[in-house]
């Protein structure tokens, strides 16, 4: 709804700006106003087709985002020996699914590292640790909550609850919009590797 929002609510919506912008969505209303794209975005990309799927996915995103894997992915990234990298994942991942996700994220980070340097997102490996991936996690929670609300899978009140969680996540992790944006780009790179068109922000 295009109701008047408070300054605080605008601030909270802005956590999802980068993700919303990529999909052509509105930045300053709870509604993204991209209804024609949402069945594809939610159904095909996220596997969300109803209220149950919506809540399950959003709860999972809040509970276990990329930040869950990041300390181990980064630790492995600093090592050259593949067996040592594998040991980190074997010791710390609780399931085969988590193990495979961590391995995939490490591959993507290796793939995009030079690109992130070239585009001056980062200047060193240390910057990856400094920014982390919480910006990506928060952006995804925010966007998916708004998309699910637009599809009437969850209520506006529920959407704001998730948006609040995303805001708290970002607010407690970053002191500037710049750092959050860099974290978003790094998280997106770890998600998609070189196929993510990281710097053109497509997809």
What are these regions (language model features)?
Residues 1-156, 160, 165-203:
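Polar/charged low-complexity regulatory segments
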């Amino acid at each position: 709804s295009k109701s008047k929002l408070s300054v605080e609510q605008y601030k909270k919506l802005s956590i999802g700006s980068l993700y919303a912008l990529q999909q052509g969505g509105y930045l300053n209303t709870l509604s993204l106003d991209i209804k024609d794209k949402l069945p594809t975005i939610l159904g095909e990309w996220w596997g969300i087709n109803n209220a149950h799927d919506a809540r399950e996915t959003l709860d999972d995103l809040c509970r276990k985002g990329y930040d869950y894997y990041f300390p181990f992915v980064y630790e492995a990234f600093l090592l050259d020996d593949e067996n040592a990298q594998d040991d980190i994942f074997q010791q710390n991942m609780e399931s085969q699914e988590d193990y495979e996700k961590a391995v995939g994220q490490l591959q993507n980070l290796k793939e995009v590292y030079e690109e992130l340097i070239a585009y001056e997102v980062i200047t060193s490996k240390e910057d990856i640790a400094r920014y982390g991936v919480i910006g990506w996690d928060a952006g995804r929670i925010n966007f998916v909550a708004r998309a699910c609300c637009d599809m009437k899978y969850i209520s506006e009140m529920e959407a704001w609850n998730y948006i609040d969680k995303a805001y708290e996540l970002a607010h407690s992790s970053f002191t500037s919009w710049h750092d959050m944006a860099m974290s978003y780009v790094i998280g997106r790179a770890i998600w998609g590797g070189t196929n993510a068109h990281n710097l053109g922000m497509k997809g």
